[in-house]
Amino acid sequence: MAKYYITPTLLNSWQYNINNGTLEDFVKVLNKEQFEPTESIQKGFEYEAYMQKNYKETLGGAYQVKVSKEYGDYLLYGIIDCLKGGIIYDYKYTKNYEVGKFYNNHQTLMYLEMVPEARKMVYLITNKFEKIEYADNNFKDIKSVAYDIGDIFREEYTKDLFPETIKTVIHKFEEWLKMYGLYETYTEKWKCKY
């Protein structure tokens, strides 16, 4: 029976720490400290809601799908933005986009492992998303909303594109936590409830 959660956010935060040396920020994630969402995070939520209601390719899909899979002592867990026709979709807002930005996102390997019947994972990305509110001239105290959206970039990945498996990533994560004396904190804070 699985003992500890592993989420894409946790692994991505760890990866960011390794690449950018922000151990303090990773420890906050590891300790599940609350934080105030940044403007970019808030725009990401709004972009996701907009896409669920308006993007033709994903209309009628299953949204906010909770997925999990036991993996030894670990329970891989995530929430898929949209699952439709054997494809996992994830909506991403980022201020600065470069081609291949999400290639190293652990979300891809995790989701394709947890949903083995999915053929691929598709990221639908924009670097411009502005919500514009204006007064509706026909009604007092009612505002109308419009959106100014930039290009929607697309990244598609299949499991066979990656040199590492999720098993390898989890092993490296576990060893790194032990090496930095953080494994005990992890097992305390990320213990499965059930």
Segment roles from a protein language model:
Residues 1-87, 185-194:
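Metal-dependent nuclease catalytic cores that hydrolyze phosphodiester bonds in DNA/RNA
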Residues 169, 174-194:
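Charged phosphate-binding loop/patch that engages nucleotide di/tri-phosphates or the phosphate backbone
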Residues 65-172, 176:
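Mg2+/Mn2+-dependent nuclease catalytic core
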